[in-house]
Amino acid sequence: MDQPQTLNEMALQGRERLFPSLTNPNWLVLRERRKIFARWLAQLPMRELDVLDVGGRVQPYRELMANRIRRYIGVDVQVTPLVDAVARAEQLPLGDATFDLVICTQVLQYIAEPSLVFAEIRRVLKPGGALLLSVPSAGLIDGVEERWRFLPAGLRYLLADFGIVEVVAEGSSVVGLFRTLNVCLDLFARLPAARFIYRRSLAPLVNLSGALAEKISGGRNQQFAVNYSVLAKK
């Protein structure tokens, strides 16, 4: 799919990630990520934030801290109107200890050496600064460049140089099951017309069924969590 090129197109895409519609096959995990990130952001002590968005071509989570931003820098390998610096995450063209917060969502699965990215993020964070991260642990392959899936123990190992690391599943195994069902059915609806019909008929039903099943189950089992959010503090 072509990347959005206008601010309006990117705003729509970012809004869909932050406040996904019921027709979105990823609705279950995206809404959980928003709640997790909002909670962590509320816990940060800084009144004003210097923010770096690694992979920030769309910047969906910028709205969560809109009233606290002092400076917001987007870095990506692709040019968009929101990107301030075109660079790889392994080589950030930024000074040491210059950011209170780094955001990096659904990027690391494409990086050959994630440890290099974490080292760079830690370098540019101020003492006491925080990283908000999201990564997949299961799901469809999204293009030929994907290399990795991540689990809690592996994430803690990669982030061992950070002082505090909290890993939270974006929903339980129940969410993982219903989200996987939704994205697989969406994949099989190959024709645009079939996908349009699916997303406006069955996809909302699968999403709502997953949310209800999650509530009934209590969300305790996380063996099939399909995505994780991470808070790491320097």
Give the location of each predicted region.
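S-adenosyl-L-methionine-dependent methyltransferase catalytic module, highlighting the catalytic core
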Residues: 115-116, 120, 126, 130-233
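A short beta-strand submotif of the Rossmann-like class I SAM-dependent methyltransferase core
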Residues: 104-107
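Surface-exposed loop/turn positions
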Residues: 49, 96-98, 128-129
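Conserved N-terminal segment of class I S-adenosyl-L-methionine
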Residues: 1-92, 101, 223-228
